[in-house]
């Protein structure tokens, strides 16, 4: 144990006769405090960035499968980076910024960097809360450091939707996907909800779709059933006449395997792959990609990148443009916050603005 002393308590105190002048005790206390705040507690500060993130993730129990996948994605990136080997006590604010800039220079997209920081920042905050660090070096606005070059997923126009669906329907190679893709455009289902649908979820008699779960596949190729994030994700969607016809065809043409695959007590999945397993989101991402690529090779007027999630955007946008009540649309989309429905999934283009202005002016 070390001690400090001074012949003066405060700076303005009188120095005793014969004693050498020195800093007052309160001044020395302030210096010591500043030095302690600048230093780091060694036992915690010696662990590496990778070890810190692993510890943080180990405490996140009971998270959804998508979240686990995201954690593993971030871990794999950090494992490949020299930054992951650094002791957390050596990481300063400028180091954190330079690392994220490096990730973008290496070709990582803004959304990937956003995901990485979304895990690393709370991990470092955990170190602060545990008194391993005094400051969180990742506590800054991401947009001030890296350029947001992400491409916003927009809803496609009705003309593009018709062209895409017509191409699929007339294609000898892709027409087997027509009914499913039509349903995605006309119901706004999440792809994980769609692939999770079973025969028991489709009520053809009353023309209803029961949505109360999602089908996911883990990194180790296990199939899992997950409930929606919130109670709003559980809903019953009415079928239009066209959607009813599509579902009826899908069920009539569905193969009957000798052994129905079962996932967490559910069986009778509408779509199976060549191995007899339920299709998952990745399958449909590939189908959409192949169709778009094929279309754009044939036609001069190119289609944008269309994905299952673009179908969901498009459904929401079309319903909003048609004047659907916002609360009804929120229910159909399964959103807990109507702000998500209105601000994220509703896309207004110039043609829509022009049409709406003409409608209002003519009504006067």
Q: Where are these predicted regions, by residue range?
A:
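Catalytic-site neighborhood detector that most strongly recognizes the C-terminal catalytic loop/helix
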Residues: 147, 155, 215, 333-358
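Conserved tyrosine-mediated DNA breakage-rejoining catalytic core shared by Y-recombinases
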Residues: 143, 197-255, 262
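N-terminal core-binding DNA-recognition domain of tyrosine site-specific recombinases/integrases
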Residues: 17-21, 45, 57-132, 172-173, ...
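Short, polar N-cap/turn motifs at the start of nucleic acid-interacting alpha helices
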Residues: 201-208, 324-344
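N-terminal DNA-binding module of tyrosine recombinases/phage integrases
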Residues: 2-90, 94, 252-266
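Short, basic (Lys/Arg/His-rich) helix/loop patches that form interaction surfaces
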Residues: 106, 110, 166-177, 187, ...
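DNA/chromatin major-groove-contacting recognition/catalytic segments
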Residues: 220-225, 322, 343, 347-364
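Basic, Lys/Arg- and aromatic-enriched nucleic-acid-binding interface segment
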Residues: 114, 133-135, 139-197, 205, ...
């Amino acid at each position: 144990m070390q001690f400090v002393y001074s012949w003066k308590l405060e700076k303005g105190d009188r120095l005793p006769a014969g004693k050498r002048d020195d800093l007052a005790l309160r001044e020395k206390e302030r210096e010591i405090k500043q030095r302690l705040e600048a230093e780091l507690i060694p036992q915690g500060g010696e662990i590496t960035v990778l070890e810190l993130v692993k510890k943080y993730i180990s405490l996140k129990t009971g998270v959804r499968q998508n979240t686990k996948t995201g954690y593993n994605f971030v871990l794999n990136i950090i494992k490949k980076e020299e930054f992951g080997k650094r002791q957390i006590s050596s990481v300063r604010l400028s180091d954190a910024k330079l690392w994220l800039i490096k990730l973008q220079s290496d070709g990582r997209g803004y959304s990937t960097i956003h995901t990485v920081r979304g895990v690393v920042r709370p991990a470092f905050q955990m170190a602060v809360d545990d008194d391993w660090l005094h400051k969180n070096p990742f506590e800054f606005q991401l947009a001030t450091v890296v350029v947001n070059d992400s491409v916003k997923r927009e809803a496609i126009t009705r003309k593009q939707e018709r062209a895409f669906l017509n191409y699929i329907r007339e294609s000898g190679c892709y027409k087997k996907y027509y009914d499913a893709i039509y349903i995605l455009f006309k119901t706004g289902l999440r792809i994980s909800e769609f692939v999770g649908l079973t025969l028991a979820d489709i009520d053809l008699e009353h023309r209803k779709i029961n949505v109360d779960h999602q089908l996911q596949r883990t990194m180790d190729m296990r199939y899992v059933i997950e409930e929606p994030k919130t109670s709003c994700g559980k809903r019953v969607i009415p079928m239009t006449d066209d959607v009813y016809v599509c579902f009826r065809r899908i069920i009539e043409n569905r193969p009957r395997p000798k052994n129905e695959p079962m996932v967490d007590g559910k069986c009778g999945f509408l779509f199976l792959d060549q191995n007899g397993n339920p299709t998952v989101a990745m399958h449909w991402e590939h189908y959409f990609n192949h169709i778009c690529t094929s279309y754009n090779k044939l036609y001069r007027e190119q289609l944008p990148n269309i994905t299952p999630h673009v179908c969901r955007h498009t459904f929401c946008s079309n319903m909003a443009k048609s004047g659907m009540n916002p609360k009804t649309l929120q229910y159909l989309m399964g959103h807990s916050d109507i702000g998500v429905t209105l601000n994220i999934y509703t896309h207004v283009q110039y043609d829509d603005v022009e049409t709406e202005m003409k409608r209002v002016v003519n009504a006067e």
